[in-house]
Amino acid sequence: MLATDWAEDAIELLQRNAERNGLFVRVARVRWSEPEPLLRAAPWDLVLGADLLYEARNAKQLAELLPGLGGDLLLAEPGRPYANEFLERFQAEPIGDRIYQLAVR
């Protein structure tokens, strides 16, 4: 398992939380605009993401990155303004068999 973020503080929290839960998790600082480390390790069995589309550039970068990672993709999105752009791209150019949209309130 590899947990990533671009913020150094988040990387430290990822490592600390894994240790507190008795888990071994590799952590890495990764920028989606420089995805080579993730792509070299592909294909991934499962890609999990939560609240990733908080900036317009994230939607574009993720849309370019995710097809190269392989495996299943599960994203949790709270309804950010840029999520529609991201979803529209994958409805036009699917990266998998299914896209489900679930609303949790």
Regions found by a protein language model. Give the residues of each.
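S-adenosylmethionine-dependent methyltransferases
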Residues: 1-105
